[in-house]
Amino acid sequence: MTVTATERIVTVFGTGNQAGAVARALLADKTSQFKVRAISRHPDSASSRTLSALGVQVVKADGWNLEELTRAFADTWAAFVNTNSDDPLFLQKGDGPTEFDLGKNIIDSLVAAKVQHLVYSCFASSVEQTKGKLFIKPMEMKYQALKYARETGHFATTCGIYAAWYYEQFLDKATADVFGGFPTTPDEEGYITFRAPLWGDDEHPSFVSITHDFGDMVHGILLEPEQWDGKSVPAASDVMTFEQLAQTLQNATGRKSRYIPLPSWEDFGRGIPELDDHKLLFAFTQATGGRYFGDVPTETKTALRLKRRAAEAQGKSGNEANLLSMEEWFKTNFA
Protein backbone atom coordinates (compact mmCIF):
# COMPACT_ATOMS: atom_id res chain seq x y z
CA MET A 1 0.00 0.00 0.00
CA THR A 2 1.47 3.35 -1.05
CA VAL A 3 0.81 6.07 1.50
CA THR A 4 0.77 9.78 0.67
CA ALA A 5 1.70 12.48 3.16
CA THR A 6 -1.96 13.18 3.99
CA GLU A 7 -3.12 9.57 4.26
CA ARG A 8 -3.24 7.73 7.57
CA ILE A 9 -3.34 3.96 7.90
CA VAL A 10 -5.63 2.53 10.57
CA THR A 11 -5.04 -1.16 11.17
CA VAL A 12 -7.57 -3.43 12.84
CA PHE A 13 -6.42 -6.64 14.47
CA GLY A 14 -8.65 -9.39 13.12
CA THR A 15 -11.59 -9.57 10.75
CA GLY A 16 -14.34 -10.61 13.19
CA ASN A 17 -17.43 -8.77 14.38
CA GLN A 18 -15.79 -5.83 16.13
CA ALA A 19 -12.82 -5.41 13.80
CA GLY A 20 -15.02 -5.78 10.73
CA ALA A 21 -17.44 -3.14 12.00
CA VAL A 22 -14.58 -0.72 12.66
CA ALA A 23 -13.11 -1.32 9.20
CA ARG A 24 -16.47 -0.64 7.51
CA ALA A 25 -17.01 2.56 9.46
CA LEU A 26 -13.56 3.88 8.57
CA LEU A 27 -14.04 3.02 4.90
CA ALA A 28 -17.14 5.24 4.90
CA ASP A 29 -15.16 8.29 6.05
CA LYS A 30 -15.23 11.06 3.43
CA THR A 31 -12.98 13.60 5.16
CA SER A 32 -9.96 11.98 6.81
CA GLN A 33 -8.25 10.00 4.03
CA PHE A 34 -8.00 6.89 6.18
CA LYS A 35 -6.52 3.79 4.61
CA VAL A 36 -7.79 0.66 6.31
CA ARG A 37 -5.75 -2.48 6.90
CA ALA A 38 -6.80 -5.70 8.64
CA ILE A 39 -4.55 -8.37 10.10
CA SER A 40 -5.70 -11.96 9.74
CA ARG A 41 -4.19 -15.39 10.25
CA HIS A 42 -6.43 -16.58 7.44
CA PRO A 43 -6.62 -13.99 4.63
CA ASP A 44 -8.56 -16.48 2.52
CA SER A 45 -11.39 -16.76 5.06
CA ALA A 46 -14.86 -15.51 4.15
CA SER A 47 -14.65 -12.54 6.51
CA SER A 48 -11.22 -11.56 5.17
CA ARG A 49 -12.34 -11.82 1.56
CA THR A 50 -15.42 -9.72 2.31
CA LEU A 51 -13.33 -6.92 3.79
CA SER A 52 -10.83 -7.14 0.94
CA ALA A 53 -13.65 -6.74 -1.58
CA LEU A 54 -14.71 -3.55 0.20
CA GLY A 55 -11.23 -2.06 -0.13
CA VAL A 56 -9.48 -3.17 3.05
CA GLN A 57 -5.87 -4.27 2.71
CA VAL A 58 -5.82 -7.70 4.40
CA VAL A 59 -2.38 -8.73 5.65
CA LYS A 60 -1.48 -12.18 6.90
CA ALA A 61 0.12 -12.35 10.35
CA ASP A 62 -0.08 -14.56 13.42
CA GLY A 63 -0.83 -12.75 16.66
CA TRP A 64 1.82 -14.79 18.44
CA ASN A 65 4.56 -13.91 15.93
CA LEU A 66 6.15 -10.60 16.92
CA GLU A 67 8.11 -10.16 13.69
CA GLU A 68 5.11 -10.88 11.47
CA LEU A 69 2.93 -8.50 13.45
CA THR A 70 5.49 -5.73 13.41
CA ARG A 71 5.70 -5.94 9.62
CA ALA A 72 1.90 -6.03 9.39
CA PHE A 73 1.62 -2.84 11.48
CA ALA A 74 4.28 -0.99 9.46
CA ASP A 75 3.38 2.66 8.70
CA THR A 76 0.23 2.38 10.83
CA TRP A 77 -0.98 5.62 12.41
CA ALA A 78 -3.61 4.05 14.70
CA ALA A 79 -4.71 0.55 15.64
CA PHE A 80 -7.89 -1.02 16.90
CA VAL A 81 -7.34 -4.25 18.83
CA ASN A 82 -9.81 -6.84 20.06
CA THR A 83 -8.73 -10.30 21.18
CA ASN A 84 -11.09 -13.27 21.35
CA SER A 85 -11.72 -14.32 24.95
CA ASP A 86 -13.57 -17.41 23.73
CA ASP A 87 -10.58 -18.79 21.83
CA PRO A 88 -10.30 -22.45 22.94
CA LEU A 89 -6.62 -21.80 23.66
CA PHE A 90 -7.59 -19.51 26.54
CA LEU A 91 -10.19 -21.91 27.96
CA GLN A 92 -7.64 -24.60 28.74
CA LYS A 93 -6.76 -25.28 32.35
CA GLY A 94 -3.18 -25.01 33.56
CA ASP A 95 -0.28 -22.78 32.60
CA GLY A 96 -0.95 -22.28 28.90
CA PRO A 97 -0.80 -18.91 27.14
CA THR A 98 -3.33 -16.32 28.26
CA GLU A 99 -5.26 -13.58 26.53
CA PHE A 100 -2.94 -11.12 28.25
CA ASP A 101 0.06 -12.83 26.66
CA LEU A 102 -1.51 -12.34 23.24
CA GLY A 103 -2.41 -8.73 24.00
CA LYS A 104 1.12 -8.02 25.23
CA ASN A 105 2.61 -9.46 22.05
CA ILE A 106 0.34 -7.29 19.92
CA ILE A 107 1.23 -4.21 21.96
CA ASP A 108 4.95 -4.97 21.71
CA SER A 109 4.57 -5.14 17.94
CA LEU A 110 2.71 -1.82 17.91
CA VAL A 111 5.56 -0.24 19.84
CA ALA A 112 8.13 -1.75 17.49
CA ALA A 113 6.16 -0.46 14.49
CA LYS A 114 5.92 3.02 16.07
CA VAL A 115 2.12 3.14 16.01
CA GLN A 116 0.94 6.36 17.68
CA HIS A 117 -2.68 5.74 18.69
CA LEU A 118 -4.41 2.71 20.20
CA VAL A 119 -8.07 1.87 20.79
CA TYR A 120 -8.32 -1.36 22.78
CA SER A 121 -11.51 -3.34 23.30
CA CYS A 122 -11.45 -4.31 26.95
CA PHE A 123 -13.15 -4.21 30.36
CA ALA A 124 -12.58 -2.69 33.76
CA SER A 125 -10.74 -4.79 36.33
CA SER A 126 -13.04 -7.29 38.04
CA VAL A 127 -10.60 -7.50 40.95
CA GLU A 128 -10.49 -3.74 41.52
CA GLN A 129 -14.22 -3.18 41.07
CA THR A 130 -15.17 -5.95 43.54
CA LYS A 131 -12.33 -5.23 45.98
CA GLY A 132 -10.80 -8.63 45.37
CA LYS A 133 -13.99 -10.70 45.66
CA LEU A 134 -14.04 -11.77 42.00
CA PHE A 135 -11.41 -12.65 39.42
CA ILE A 136 -13.03 -12.89 35.99
CA LYS A 137 -10.37 -13.99 33.58
CA PRO A 138 -11.53 -12.32 30.33
CA MET A 139 -12.10 -8.99 32.08
CA GLU A 140 -8.79 -9.11 33.90
CA MET A 141 -6.70 -10.18 30.91
CA LYS A 142 -8.06 -7.39 28.70
CA TYR A 143 -7.72 -4.83 31.48
CA GLN A 144 -4.12 -5.83 32.13
CA ALA A 145 -3.29 -5.64 28.42
CA LEU A 146 -4.46 -2.03 28.12
CA LYS A 147 -2.69 -1.20 31.37
CA TYR A 148 0.50 -2.65 29.94
CA ALA A 149 0.08 -0.56 26.78
CA ARG A 150 -0.20 2.60 28.85
CA GLU A 151 2.77 1.66 31.00
CA THR A 152 5.02 1.40 27.94
CA GLY A 153 4.85 5.18 27.68
CA HIS A 154 5.06 4.81 23.92
CA PHE A 155 1.62 5.78 22.62
CA ALA A 156 0.51 9.33 21.96
CA THR A 157 -3.01 8.27 22.97
CA THR A 158 -4.72 5.17 24.31
CA CYS A 159 -8.45 4.60 24.76
CA GLY A 160 -10.33 1.61 26.14
CA ILE A 161 -13.73 0.79 24.68
CA TYR A 162 -16.10 -1.45 26.66
CA ALA A 163 -18.56 -3.31 24.45
CA ALA A 164 -22.02 -3.91 25.91
CA TRP A 165 -24.09 -7.02 25.26
CA TYR A 166 -24.23 -7.54 21.47
CA TYR A 167 -27.67 -7.27 19.87
CA GLU A 168 -26.38 -9.77 17.33
CA GLN A 169 -25.97 -12.49 19.96
CA PHE A 170 -29.75 -12.85 19.94
CA LEU A 171 -29.48 -14.20 16.38
CA ASP A 172 -27.52 -17.22 17.59
CA LYS A 173 -29.65 -20.27 18.41
CA ALA A 174 -27.19 -21.63 20.96
CA THR A 175 -27.31 -18.32 22.81
CA ALA A 176 -31.11 -18.29 22.65
CA ASP A 177 -31.21 -21.77 24.16
CA VAL A 178 -29.09 -20.63 27.10
CA PHE A 179 -31.57 -17.82 27.79
CA GLY A 180 -34.67 -20.00 27.70
CA GLY A 181 -35.32 -19.68 23.96
CA PHE A 182 -35.42 -15.88 23.90
CA PRO A 183 -36.12 -14.21 21.49
CA THR A 184 -37.45 -16.91 19.15
CA THR A 185 -38.77 -20.04 20.88
CA PRO A 186 -41.91 -20.05 23.07
CA ASP A 187 -41.85 -21.92 26.37
CA GLU A 188 -44.43 -24.50 27.46
CA GLU A 189 -46.85 -21.69 28.42
CA GLY A 190 -46.56 -19.95 25.06
CA TYR A 191 -44.36 -17.07 26.23
CA ILE A 192 -41.06 -15.97 24.76
CA THR A 193 -39.28 -16.12 28.08
CA PHE A 194 -35.94 -14.53 28.89
CA ARG A 195 -34.28 -16.50 31.69
CA ALA A 196 -31.20 -14.96 33.25
CA PRO A 197 -29.89 -14.10 36.72
CA LEU A 198 -30.78 -10.79 38.32
CA TRP A 199 -28.55 -7.94 37.17
CA GLY A 200 -27.93 -5.46 39.98
CA ASP A 201 -29.61 -2.70 41.93
CA ASP A 202 -28.41 0.63 40.57
CA GLU A 203 -27.66 0.42 36.84
CA HIS A 204 -29.46 -1.42 34.05
CA PRO A 205 -28.14 -3.90 31.46
CA SER A 206 -26.70 -2.33 28.32
CA PHE A 207 -26.76 -3.52 24.72
CA VAL A 208 -24.91 -2.53 21.55
CA SER A 209 -25.44 -3.09 17.85
CA ILE A 210 -22.02 -4.12 16.59
CA THR A 211 -23.02 -3.87 12.93
CA HIS A 212 -24.85 -0.52 13.17
CA ASP A 213 -23.11 1.43 15.94
CA PHE A 214 -19.91 -0.04 17.38
CA GLY A 215 -17.68 0.70 14.40
CA ASP A 216 -18.91 4.28 14.30
CA MET A 217 -18.02 4.73 17.97
CA VAL A 218 -14.43 3.68 17.31
CA HIS A 219 -14.41 5.85 14.18
CA GLY A 220 -15.50 8.80 16.32
CA ILE A 221 -12.64 8.18 18.75
CA LEU A 222 -10.08 8.05 15.94
CA LEU A 223 -11.30 11.34 14.48
CA GLU A 224 -10.21 13.08 17.70
CA PRO A 225 -7.93 10.63 19.57
CA GLU A 226 -6.46 13.29 21.84
CA GLN A 227 -9.90 13.98 23.32
CA TRP A 228 -10.22 10.33 24.36
CA ASP A 229 -6.70 9.70 25.60
CA GLY A 230 -6.65 7.78 28.88
CA LYS A 231 -10.42 7.41 28.91
CA SER A 232 -12.75 4.42 28.81
CA VAL A 233 -15.82 4.54 26.57
CA PRO A 234 -19.05 2.63 27.33
CA ALA A 235 -20.13 1.26 23.95
CA ALA A 236 -23.90 1.02 24.42
CA SER A 237 -26.71 1.57 21.92
CA ASP A 238 -29.56 1.04 24.41
CA VAL A 239 -30.03 0.51 28.14
CA MET A 240 -32.97 -1.27 29.78
CA THR A 241 -33.93 -3.76 32.47
CA PHE A 242 -34.51 -7.39 31.58
CA GLU A 243 -38.23 -6.82 32.16
CA GLN A 244 -38.08 -3.97 29.65
CA LEU A 245 -36.13 -6.17 27.25
CA ALA A 246 -38.95 -8.71 27.21
CA GLN A 247 -41.56 -5.97 26.84
CA THR A 248 -39.56 -4.45 23.98
CA LEU A 249 -39.62 -7.75 22.11
CA GLN A 250 -43.38 -7.98 22.68
CA ASN A 251 -43.88 -4.42 21.41
CA ALA A 252 -41.79 -5.13 18.33
CA THR A 253 -43.25 -8.51 17.39
CA GLY A 254 -46.64 -8.80 19.07
CA ARG A 255 -45.56 -12.07 20.67
CA LYS A 256 -46.18 -12.24 24.41
CA SER A 257 -42.87 -12.14 26.25
CA ARG A 258 -41.63 -12.08 29.83
CA TYR A 259 -38.55 -12.19 32.04
CA ILE A 260 -38.16 -14.88 34.68
CA PRO A 261 -35.02 -14.50 36.80
CA LEU A 262 -32.88 -17.50 37.60
CA PRO A 263 -32.51 -18.13 41.35
CA SER A 264 -28.74 -17.56 41.29
CA TRP A 265 -26.00 -16.45 38.91
CA GLU A 266 -24.56 -19.93 39.43
CA ASP A 267 -27.58 -21.40 37.62
CA PHE A 268 -26.70 -19.66 34.36
CA GLY A 269 -25.32 -22.10 31.81
CA ARG A 270 -25.17 -24.87 34.39
CA GLY A 271 -23.30 -27.85 32.99
CA ILE A 272 -21.73 -25.87 30.14
CA PRO A 273 -18.03 -25.34 31.00
CA GLU A 274 -17.59 -22.80 28.19
CA LEU A 275 -19.96 -20.45 30.07
CA ASP A 276 -18.11 -20.54 33.39
CA ASP A 277 -16.52 -17.13 32.83
CA HIS A 278 -19.72 -15.69 31.35
CA LYS A 279 -21.81 -16.59 34.39
CA LEU A 280 -19.34 -14.70 36.56
CA LEU A 281 -20.35 -11.52 34.75
CA PHE A 282 -23.71 -11.78 36.53
CA ALA A 283 -21.88 -12.24 39.82
CA PHE A 284 -19.92 -9.11 38.91
CA THR A 285 -22.97 -6.96 38.16
CA GLN A 286 -24.72 -8.17 41.32
CA ALA A 287 -21.62 -7.26 43.35
CA THR A 288 -21.28 -3.81 41.76
CA GLY A 289 -24.91 -2.69 41.65
CA GLY A 290 -25.22 -3.38 37.95
CA ARG A 291 -22.08 -1.49 36.93
CA TYR A 292 -21.13 -3.73 34.00
CA PHE A 293 -18.68 -1.10 32.76
CA GLY A 294 -17.10 -0.91 36.19
CA ASP A 295 -15.25 2.39 36.34
CA VAL A 296 -17.57 4.34 33.99
CA PRO A 297 -21.35 4.80 34.26
CA THR A 298 -23.83 2.88 32.11
CA GLU A 299 -25.13 5.44 29.60
CA THR A 300 -25.56 6.06 25.87
CA LYS A 301 -24.74 9.77 25.64
CA THR A 302 -21.05 9.13 25.00
CA ALA A 303 -21.80 6.56 22.32
CA LEU A 304 -24.28 8.91 20.64
CA ARG A 305 -21.73 11.72 20.62
CA LEU A 306 -19.20 9.45 18.90
CA LYS A 307 -21.82 8.09 16.51
CA ARG A 308 -22.77 11.59 15.38
CA ARG A 309 -19.15 12.64 15.00
CA ALA A 310 -18.54 9.63 12.75
CA ALA A 311 -21.77 10.25 10.83
CA GLU A 312 -20.63 13.79 10.10
CA ALA A 313 -17.37 12.47 8.63
CA GLN A 314 -19.32 9.88 6.65
CA GLY A 315 -21.74 12.44 5.21
CA LYS A 316 -24.71 10.94 7.04
CA SER A 317 -27.53 12.70 8.86
CA GLY A 318 -30.99 12.15 10.28
CA ASN A 319 -31.73 8.69 11.61
CA GLU A 320 -28.45 7.37 10.21
CA ALA A 321 -26.68 9.50 12.79
CA ASN A 322 -28.62 7.98 15.69
CA LEU A 323 -27.99 4.85 17.70
CA LEU A 324 -30.12 1.85 16.79
CA SER A 325 -32.69 1.09 19.48
CA MET A 326 -33.32 -2.44 20.64
CA GLU A 327 -36.96 -2.17 19.55
CA GLU A 328 -35.98 -1.16 16.01
CA TRP A 329 -33.52 -4.04 15.86
CA PHE A 330 -36.10 -6.56 17.12
CA LYS A 331 -38.59 -5.31 14.50
CA THR A 332 -36.06 -5.74 11.71
CA ASN A 333 -34.97 -9.22 12.73
CA PHE A 334 -37.98 -10.89 14.38
CA ALA A 335 -41.22 -9.11 13.44
Curated annotation (Swiss-Prot):
UniProt binding sites for NADP(+): 14-18, 41-45, 62-63, 83-85, 142, 166-169
Keyword Transmembrane included in the entry's annotation: no
EC annotation from Swiss-Prot or TrEMBL: 1.-.-.-
CDD domains attached to this UniProt entry: NmrA_like_SDR_a
Enzyme class: oxidoreductase
GO cellular component, one term: nucleus
Keywords: NADP, Oxidoreductase
Protein name: NmrA-like family domain-containing oxidoreductase lnbB
Biological classification of the source: Eukaryota, Fungi, Dikarya, Ascomycota, Pezizomycotina
Gene: lnaB
